[in-house]
Amino acid sequence: MSTGNGAVITQVKKYMFNSTLKRMSVLAEIKDSQGTSLRVLIKGAPEVLKTYMKTTPKNYDETYLGYVKNGARVLAMAYKSVSKMNKADQLAYPREEAESDLIFAGFVIAECPLKDDTNAVMTELKEASHEVKMITGDNALTAAFIG
């Protein structure tokens, strides 16, 4: 993949998304005008990634929770630079080491608006004595926003 500044990013190893871990990451080789470097790039649930970061901004929790409470889906993004290593070592690089001492890069906020009639349908079901259950992989606060 090429970036706007001429850098070329190549995925070297992928640590697959796992619903228990609530994150996924890649080891990527970045070639730019400065040379070639290795980085771990990671995305995942903000409450999970926070535990793997060196530091987080003072308002980290308040920021992502504010969006979640209003129904948004939030992912945290982080990275770290990795020392150069040969291809065999890159492929053997353990996930536990890759996903440690991360640097916070930001949040991705995705708004998924409800259909116009969602609240009315939920109310109608409840008033008809139906027990309504919600099954979701979203943050519990996002689900609470929906009702």
Task: Outline where the language-model segments fall.
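Cytosolic catalytic regions of ATP/NTP-dependent phosphoryl-transfer enzymes
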Residues: 1-104, 110, 119, 123-128, ...
